[in-house]
Structures are given as C-alpha cells and as structure tokens.
Curated annotation (Swiss-Prot):
It is found in: Cell inner membrane. It catalyses: K(+)(in) + H(+)(in) = K(+)(out) + H(+)(out). It is a multi-pass membrane protein. Transport of potassium into the cell. Likely operates as a K(+):H(+) symporter. The chain crosses the membrane at residues 15-35, 59-79, 109-129, 145-165, 173-193, 223-243, 255-275, 297-317, 345-365, 374-394, 405-425, 427-447. It comes from the Bacteria. One of its GO terms (cellular component) is plasma membrane. One of its GO terms (molecular function) is symporter activity. Keywords: Cell inner membrane, Cell membrane, Ion transport, Membrane, Potassium, Potassium transport, Symport, Transmembrane, Transmembrane helix, Transport. Signal peptide: none annotated. This is Probable potassium transport system protein Kup 1. Belongs to the HAK/KUP transporter (TC 2.A.72) family.
C-alpha cells in the first residue's frame, strides 16, 4: 500500500513538473497575447468605437475563439492526432501521407499543402519575437512618456541578446521558464480580478449573444475587428507542436486548470477597465495595473515575451531539422546544446536569418500597432492548413469517414476562414510581409525537393546495376588493398559513382567494401532494433541500410557499430569513407524552370557536407567529385 502511494506521488510530481515546464514553453506565445489583443481592437490602426456593445461583443468573441479554436479544436481533437507521440505540422503531414501511399497524385497535394503550412510557420516565426518584445517594452511609454525614444533601441538590444545566447542552448535558463510563466499567468489573473471587481457585469460577455450582436451591429467593420480578435489565439499551434516534449495530458490540464482561466480573467479585466474609463483603451493591459506595479510589470512582461520568442525560435530549429531529414531543405549545420535532451538544438543559419528578419521588422514597423497588421495572417493560414490535413487523418486514420470528419472540421474552418478573411484585409498595411516570407520559404522548400528528385533520377539513369558489377568482378578482379571502404550510396540497387571513380583512377578495391544507404522515414523515431539492415553480397561486398525517423539524430559510426551482431565489425582506424560530391550545371529546357534550377544549384553548392551531417570522422573521409548536367 505504502509503495503504491509512493509511486502515485512520484507520478503526480512528474506530472506537475511536466505541466509547469509546459507553461514555460508551450504557452509563452498565447500567454503574451493580452499585451496587445484588446488594445488592437479599440486603439489599433482600424479601431472600433468604445461603446458598451463593442466592449461586451469583442470580449465575447475573444472568449469563444479561445474555447472553439484552442479548447475544442486543438486540445480535444488535434492533439489526439499524434505520430507516435509527436505533434506539429511535419507529424501531421506524415500521418496524412500514410493514408494515400498508393495514390501519388493525392500524396503530392498533401505534400504541397503541408509544406505551405510549414512555410507559413516561418512567416509567423519572424513576426512573433518582434511583436511580443516590442509590445512589452512599450509599457515604458505608459510608465514614463519621456522614455518613448528608447523603446526601439531597447527592443533591439533585448532581441539581439535573445538570438546571441541561442548558441549556448536553453538548458540552463530553460529551468526558469516554467516558474516565470507561472508568475506571469498569476499576474494576469490578479490584474483581471482587480478590475472585474469594479465592474462585475462585464462577465455577462461570456454570453455568445453579445458576440453575435456585435457582428450584426458592426456589419462589414466587424470583419476588421475579427482580424484583431484572432490575436488572442496566436500561439495555439504550439500546443500541438510541442506535444512530443511534454505529452498531451500535462499540456491539456495546464490549459484548462490555469492558462485559460488566467487569460479569460485578464481579458475581461481589461474590458472592465475600458468600461469604466474609455481613455484606457490606448493600452488597457498596462493601465490595468496600479502605478506602483507598472515597472515590475514591464520587466515581467519583457521576460514573458522573451520566453514566448524563445519557444518560436526553438520551434523554427526543430521544424527545420525535421524538414531537412524529410528532404525539403538542404543539409545545414546542427549543433546539439544538451547532452541529455536531443530536442535542444541550434542551427546557426536559421538563427541569424531569423534575427535579421526580426530586426528589419522592428525598424520598419516601429510600433506594435503597426506590427499587428503583419501578425495573424500566417497564423490563421497555418490553422486552416492544419484543419485540412487533420480532416484527412480523422477520416482515414481514425476511420470516421469523410462525412463525419468533414462535418466536424467544417465547424472549425467556418471560424478560421473568417479569421483568415479578416487578416487578408491587413495585407496592404503589413500583412504582405509574412506572406512574402512564407511564400519565399515555400519556393525554396519545393525547389529543393523537386531538384533532389531530378538529380536522383538523372544519376539513376546513368547507374550501373550492382548485380552486373559484382558478376564482372568474378572474371576481372582488380587489386584488393587492406582495410574497409564505406561508400555512401543513394540507390541500394546501383553502384555508387564514388566507387566507380575510385576504381577508374586508383585501379584498386579495398579488402572489404560496404555500400551504405541512409534512409529517412516519416515517423519520428526508429528503434535501435530496426535501425540497420545488413546483407552480405559477393566478393566481400556488404550492403548496409540505416533507417532514421525525422526526429532522430543521424550518426553513421554509431549505427555501423550495431552491425557487429550481423558479423560486420568495424575498426575506426581501418575504415575509410568515400563520398561522392556532384557539381551541378543548370541547362535550359529541363523539367524544372531555369530560374528554379539556378536556385537549386545555389542551394546545393551551399548545403552542409554529408561528413558533418552524418557525424563521420573527417580525417577518414575521401571525397570524389563528378559533374552532372540537370
């Protein structure tokens, strides 16, 4: 009995720790939305009049958006669509693709829609840090208007420090994220209660009738307001994306028990404040605090927005690595910043690229009011794409059938498409930025995928069949030298070009030759028992296939060590790795547009080396080049 209670207690402690950690990572973005959501409705670039109906109506819409989009869609349904415990757009693409493996045309469209969703994520990832940190630092203007000239420089400094420390990893400071966000959400709730007490009638806005009346009364202008209401649910996709780190239950319990109540109390508190003092609409979040709490609140808000930005940056690293292993982006340098957590990674190219984009946004838009126009369209586009992919998964994987699945997600899409339409109106004011950025990423990802496919087809067309090559060795065996040669081989049925070049120029073969193929599958992880497949061929040739999931960390020497059980042992001092390196030449009239060929060639030229990506010892590598005309 005592042992059972102790186990339950440990389990409870573990669950509480996961829920606290989820507060710091999952809820940073949506948790900082109170800084600007209500303000943008009444004091943004397209404000609505401060009337009782508009206050009640906008709060009602915010509340029901949180319920329908976050509580029902994401927590109740989407988070159940996991790929072996993992969530996020890449996991959803993989699940949807499983349903159409025998229909290439359907798979193509699922791939296009999914990649578009991933590209929109990058557009959102550029705007979120700029919008969040700038909104927090703007609190200084409320405290002391004389500090207004320092808002932009201070925002730039905070953002630079944020991106600069990424290479050190978040393992140390990450331990503080949860407690800081616990204080933040507690502060949100207390500020809300403080103002609701003065005008408790504001709670009547929980009635959806006020939201409907607001839409009917404001007619076309209500669509503009909906573009600002959606700011309250930005960050909802993080619940699904980070599910693999914390699990569905800790994330959902934290939402219903703590995050949702704190957000609702704060939004309604801001509404109560504006109800009593319409002038407070210019910045209701900071004006809802007592004077003595203003500077501490600015400091806490800045910390919270840095944490929210950190989650987006880490998400960009994670999505990029997954996209890399699924073949949508070229290999690039990946640094692992924690010995214990393989999810904690750092990609220098992504980090500095994001930083430049964020700095340009801050300098270009110069205020959170202006940035709000750029915020939302990428998020709502991502939500719509998630609903489309989830419909496929629910219909085919969960076996609900198209009618029931379509009916369910039609309800969500009816809300999300209104949000998307509202944000399309923002395109001239700044919504073009995440769209252009997202479409740019989409073009790069699809160009890389298509280019790799064309290159593979070209090399396959020139290949020598492995069986024919091995048969020819029996009649004309070249000189064999001591040691083991490992040739990376994209096509297990063909002879690697590097092997043919080595044989042509050096006239020798190693005593033992290993043809190594590395394959990536649309599952998060591959267990060790399935990691390697070993086959012995003729003439002391061996075929080894290493299989990774899209979240695995490729390490060829470690994987090859598992081959010993199949009779293929490796000595690091006697093993050489031969890698082919192609020089690409674009040409007019190929299957891909010439301008895309040029982009692909540039990406290919700047891609990271296979040596670093697969953790192969550089002092044991021989690279052999060849020219390929696309």
């Amino acid at each position: 009995m005592g042992s059972h209670e102790q186990t339950a207690d440990v389990t409870g402690q573990r669950f509480a720790a996961l829920a606290l950690a989820a507060l710091g990572v999952v809820y940073g973005d949506i948790g900082t939305s109170p800084l600007y959501a209500v303000k943008e409705v009444f004091a943004g670039n397209h404000p609505i009049p401060v009337t009782m109906l508009n206050i009640y109506g906008s709060l009602s819409l915010i509340f029901w958006a949180l319920v329908i989009v976050v509580s029902v869609k994401y927590v109740t349904f989407i988070m159940r669509a996991d790929n072996r415990g993992e969530g996020g757009i890449m996991a959803l693409i993989a699940l949807a693709l499983h349903t159409v493996h025998d229909k290439p045309q359907h798979a193509k469209w699922i791939m296009i829609v999914g990649v578009l969703g991933a590209a929109m994520f990058y557009g959102d990832g550029m705007v979120t840090p700029a919008m969040s940190v700038l909104s927090a630092v703007e609190g200084l203007e409320v405290a002391t208007p004389a500090l207004k000239p320092f808002v932009i420089p201070l925002t730039m400094v905070v953002l630079f420090i944020l991106f600069f420390v990424q290479r050190s990893g978040t393992a140390t400071v990450g331990a503080f994220f949860g407690p800081v966000m616990l204080v933040w959400f507690s502060a949100l709730a207390l500020l809300g209660v403080h103002n609701i007490v003065d005008h408790p009638a504001i709670l009547m806005a929980l009635n959806p009738a006020y939201g409907i009346e607001f839409l009917l009364e404001n007619k076309a202008h209500s669509l503009v307001a909906m573009g600002n209401v959606v700011l309250a649910v930005t960050g909802a996709e993080a619940l699904y994306a980070d599910m693999g780190h914390f699990g569905r239950k800790p994330i959902s319990r934290a939402w219903f028990a703590f995050v949702l109540p704190a957000l609702v109390l704060n939004y309604f508190g801001q509404g109560a404040l504006i109800l009593g003092d319409p002038e407070a609409a210019k910045n209701p979040f900071f004006l809802s605090a007592p004077d003595w709490a203003l500077y501490p609140l600015v400091g806490l808000a800045t910390l919270a927005t840095v944490i929210a930005s950190q989650a987006v940056i880490s998400g960009a690293f994670s999505v990029t690595r997954q996209a890399m292993q699924l073949g949508f982006v070229p290999r690039m340098e990946v640094q692992y910043t924690s010995d214990r957590e393989q999810g904690q990674i750092y990609l220098p190219a992504v980090n500095w690229g994001l930083m430049v984009a964020v700095m340009i946004l801050v300098l270009g838009f110069r205020s959170s009011n202006n940035l709000a126009a750029a915020y939302g369209i990428a998020v709502t586009g991502d939500m719509v794409i998630t609903s489309i992919l989830a419909t496929v998964v629910v219909a085919k994987v969960w076996k609900w059938g198209w009618f029931k699945a379509g009916l369910l997600f039609a309800c969500f899409l009816s809300v999300e498409l209104v949000f998307l339409a509202a944000n399309i109106l923002k395109i001239p004011d700044g919504g073009w930025f995440p769209l252009v950025a997202g479409m740019g990423v989409f073009v790069l990802m699809t160009t890389w995928k298509r280019g790799r496919q064309l290159l593979s087809d070209r090399l396959r067309g020139e290949r020598l069949e492995l069986s024919m090559f091995l048969d020819s060795l029996a009649s004309s065996m070249p000189t064999r030298v001591a040691g083991t040669a490992v040739f990376l081989n994209a096509d297990p049925k063909g002879v690697p070009h590097a092997l043919l070049h080595n044989l042509m120029h050096n006239k020798v073969l190693h005593e033992r030759v290993v043809l190594l193929s590395v394959q990536f599958f649309d599952v998060p992880y591959v267990p060790d028992i399935d990691l390697v497949e070993v086959r012995q061929l003729k003439e002391n040739f061996w075929s080894v296939v290493i299989q990774y999931g899209f979240k695995d960390i490729p390490n060829v020497p470690e994987a090859l060590a598992l081959c010993a059980d199949a009779g293929l042992a490796f000595s690091s001092l006697e093993t050489s790795y031969f890698i082919g390196r192609e020089t690409l030449i674009p040409r007019l009239g190929s299957e891909m547009a010439f301008w895309r060929e040029k982009i692909f060639v540039a990406m290919f030229r700047n891609a990271g080396s296979a040596t670093a990506f697969f953790k192969i010892p550089s002092n044991r590598v021989v690279e052999l080049g060849t020219q390929v005309v696309l």
